């Protein structure tokens, strides 16, 4: 991981556009300016200049911006050239810059990586840049901006600071056991620990919301042929995404639709009807259906209400329930309520959710949308929220587990040394979110998923 050479990349998307931007970062940025512009622009002022080739001919003309380090995005000297967005022009300008000594193409995410390494961003803020670019809804974008501005990092730093303060008390109790006041047994440390655990649980709740905003919920519609699975997909999507006929086995492959329910991304997957396959193509489709089911966050078990009065999943189709992963949440959807005359609504049957609706007429679909949102614990229009990734949730869970174990050591045995170690491990897990304890390999994987010009 070299940060001594100077990097260049296109910061705007590939293809034609009104404006195309090349970004340069590193110690040779000023040399690039002199070579291409004939001068070094005044720092942080827009300068309209021709962009020159090696022979002095004009390649393009546009705006040049120069940001001397450390007062730049990366913390290094940065030069931005904003010209016309034609791919040929940008390619010629890029080749011109790369012909200079010490210049190379940036790796994906390397600008953000350098900003992180130069303490311009912490890891959570750097990841928020990619999340903002990838945001699929207004609420996700707003939460990504909050993360970029440090909302998530600030919550983590507060927890780390509280743990540091708590560790001081614990270490003092260990090092000075003969003092008049025993911090381990007088309840003070336990009270502070309970407070940190409560704060951490609140951050975990908000982080789960942020993870849902970023990654969404994967819902698989499964059931026998002709149960109305494709009709339900179309009803949820609000368009004719799947072919619907009265012929059993019309859907032969996996169909995917991406929608939003009050800001929560929902990945709906329609699958082939589950039965004994009639041919090789259908067999492959059914295998793919089971693969999707096993990876789902929730399964909508589609039942044709005209074929059975049963409401208990195991009574409807015991073989299907036997093959489902035991921990996989399911919602039984009794379809065709417009024909059976069943009352629309959501009920519980032996711990499983059951909803009666009509995918054909759309009756009960709004109820299903609300159910999906509530089943994931999603709250829309959360003010001041932040985005979170699965590794963030894992780090928060690990920290919570260490605090629980430390609390057990404290209340059962006043074991200061064991409590101190659990507090240290919890603090380390939290610091991984902001990058203070991240390995180079982990950082490489994170930043390689970014855009080239970021």
UniProtKB/Swiss-Prot annotation:
GO CC term, one of those recorded: cytoplasm
TrmE-type G domain location, by residue? Answer: 216-377
Output this protein's name.
tRNA modification GTPase MnmE
Q: Name the InterPro entries for this protein.
A: G_TrmE, GTP-bd, GTP-bd_TrmE_N, GTPase_MnmE, MnmE_dom2, MnmE_helical, P-loop_NTPase, Small_GTP-bd
Source organism superkingdom: Bacteria
Q: Which annotated residues bind Mg(2+)?
A: 230, 251
What is the enzyme's main class? hydrolase
Recorded hits in CDD domains, A to Z, give: trmE, TrmE_N
Annotated organism of origin = Yersinia pestis
């Amino acid at each position: 991981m070299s940060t001594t050479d100077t990097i260049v990349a296109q910061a705007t998307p590939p293809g034609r556009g009104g404006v195309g931007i090349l970004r340069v970062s590193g110690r040779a940025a000023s040399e690039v300016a002199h070579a291409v512009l004939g001068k070094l622009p005044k720092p942080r002022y827009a300068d309209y200049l021709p962009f020159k080739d090696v022979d002095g001919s004009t390649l393009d003309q546009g705006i040049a911006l120069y940001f001397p380090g450390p007062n730049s995005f990366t913390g290094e000297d940065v030069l931005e050239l904003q010209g016309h967005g034609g791919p040929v022009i940008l390619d010629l300008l890029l080749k011109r810059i790369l012909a200079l000594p010490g210049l190379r193409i940036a790796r994906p995410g390397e600008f953000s990586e350098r900003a992180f390494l130069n303490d311009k961003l912490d890891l959570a803020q750097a990841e928020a840049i990619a999340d903002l670019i990838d945001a699929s809804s207004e609420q996700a974008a707003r939460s990504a901006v909050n993360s970029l501005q440090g909302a998530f990092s600030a919550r983590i730093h507060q927890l780390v600071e509280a743990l540091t303060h708590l560790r001081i008390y614990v270490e003092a109790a260990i090092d000075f056991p003969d003092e008049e006041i025993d911090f381990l047994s007088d309840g003070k440390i336990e009270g502070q620990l309970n407070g940190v655990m409560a704060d951490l649980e609140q951050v975990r709740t908000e982080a789960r919301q942020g993870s849902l905003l970023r990654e969404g919920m994967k819902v698989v519609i499964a059931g026998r042929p002709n149960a109305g699975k494709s009709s339900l997909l179309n009803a949820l999507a609000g368009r004719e995404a799947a072919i619907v006929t009265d012929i059993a086995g019309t859907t032969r492959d996996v169909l995917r639709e991406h929608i939003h329910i009050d800001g929560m991304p929902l990945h709906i997957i329609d699958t082939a009807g589950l039965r004994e396959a009639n041919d090789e193509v259908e067999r492959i489709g059914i295998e793919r259906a089971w693969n999707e089911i096993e990876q789902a966050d929730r399964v909508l078990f589609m039942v044709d209400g005209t074929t059975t009065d049963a409401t208990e999943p195991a009574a409807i189709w015991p073989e299907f329930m036997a093959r489902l992963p035991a921990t996989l949440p399911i919602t039984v959807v009794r379809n065709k309520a417009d024909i059976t005359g069943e009352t629309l609504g959501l009920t519980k049957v032996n711990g499983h959710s059951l909803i009666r609706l009509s995918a054909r007429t759309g009756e009960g679909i709004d109820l299903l949308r609300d159910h999906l949102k509530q089943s994931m614990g999603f709250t829309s229009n959360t003010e001041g929220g932040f985005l979170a990734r699965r590794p963030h949730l894992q780090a928060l869970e690990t920290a919570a587990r260490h605090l629980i174990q430390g609390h057990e050591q404290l209340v059962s045995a006043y074991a200061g040394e064991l409590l101190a170690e659990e507090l240290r491990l919890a603090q380390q897990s939290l610091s991984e979110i902001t990058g203070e304890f991240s390995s180079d390999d982990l950082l490489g994987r994170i930043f390689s998923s970014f855009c080239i010009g970021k």
